[in-house]
């Protein structure tokens, strides 16, 4: 477990359950078990880490890993091979303080029902998976080059592209 590793989260709340349910149609049970995604930032020395994530307050880098999936679970996976870690982390650092993409969440919901027909998002805003997807693109993750719109990538899509196993 090192800085830059990706954290796939499964929380217990209603919003998390809705995200998992919506992803299940396109990504199946294995990948759709995750409803939030973050990236390890700094080791706190006590077994906990701070994480980069997009949350309702915007993009942050100070929340503790132990707090981001309340009542649920998380899985840490290595940054995919071939990703330039310096560029990946550099991109995340540059986005700290940007606002949350509430319109992108709405756009994701429309995409699941009416693929590529309605695009709703505001520039300089992020959802959790869009932030990580953009960082992966910036870091040179080749599998990400096939994503038609990294602003509306969902956690299951990243899990699938990173070829995680159940």
Model-identified regions with their sequence ranges:
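Cysteine-nucleophile amide-bond enzymes
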Residues: 1-166
């Amino acid at each position: 477990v090192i800085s830059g590793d990706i954290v796939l989260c499964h929380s217990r709340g209603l919003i998390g359950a809705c995200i998992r349910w919506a992803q299940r149609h396109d990504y199946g049970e294995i990948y759709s078990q995750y409803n939030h995604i973050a990236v390890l930032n700094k080791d706190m020395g006590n077994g906990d880490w701070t994480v980069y994530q997009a949350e309702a307050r915007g993009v942050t880098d100070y929340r503790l890993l132990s707090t981001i999936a309340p009542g649920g679970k998380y899985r840490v996976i290595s940054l995919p091979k071939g990703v330039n870690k310096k560029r990946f982390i550099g991109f995340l650092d540059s986005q700290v303080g940007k606002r949350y993409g509430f319109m992108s969440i709405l756009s994701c919901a429309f995409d699941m029902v009416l693929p590529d027909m309605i695009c709703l998002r505001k520039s300089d805003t992020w959802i959790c998976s869009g932030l990580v997807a953009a960082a992966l693109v910036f870091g040179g993750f080749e599998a990400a080059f096939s994503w038609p719109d990294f602003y509306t990538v969902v956690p299951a899509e990243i899990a699938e592209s990173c070829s995680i196993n159940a």
